[in-house]
């Protein structure tokens, strides 16, 4: 693993060599999904993740659109920051919405991979991400 500081990380183990990824990637959880992860220590994801065969994540620049598209109007959500370097070779960057590359984990997410998790409040009909969200 090669790490380049400047709010990004170059990780040779994931995808093509030199692919720049953020140090942190993000997962939006419903309350019961977050509670289950805390209780069991790992998850295979939400129903959509199980259907697709991988756990969906977003970068910081993709997360608001993900919230708007998949969680519009939903309350009791949490956003978790995941250290991408802890996920190993199961993390793949794949083209998805609008031709953008999204991080997908082929495997389980462990609670030890979570750097922090905070409530994602609904403010005036839109989810408001925390200040520490980078």
Where are these regions (language model features)?
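Conserved, structured core segments of small domains
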Residues: 23-134
């Amino acid at each position: 693993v090669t790490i380049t500081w400047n709010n990004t990380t170059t990780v040779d183990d994931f995808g093509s060599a030199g692919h720049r990824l953020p140090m942190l990637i993000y997962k939006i959880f419903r309350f019961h999904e977050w509670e289950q992860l805390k209780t069991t220590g790992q998850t295979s994801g939400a129903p959509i993740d199980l259907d697709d065969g991988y756990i969906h994540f977003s970068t910081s620049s993709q997360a608001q659109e993900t919230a708007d598209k998949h969680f519009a109007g939903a309350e009791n959500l949490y956003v978790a920051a995941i250290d991408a370097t802890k996920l190993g070779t199961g993390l793949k960057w794949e083209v998805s919405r609008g031709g953008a590359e999204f991080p997908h984990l082929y495997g389980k997410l462990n609670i030890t991979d979570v750097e922090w998790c905070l409530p994602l409040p609904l403010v005036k009909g839109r989810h408001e991400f925390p200040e520490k969200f980078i």
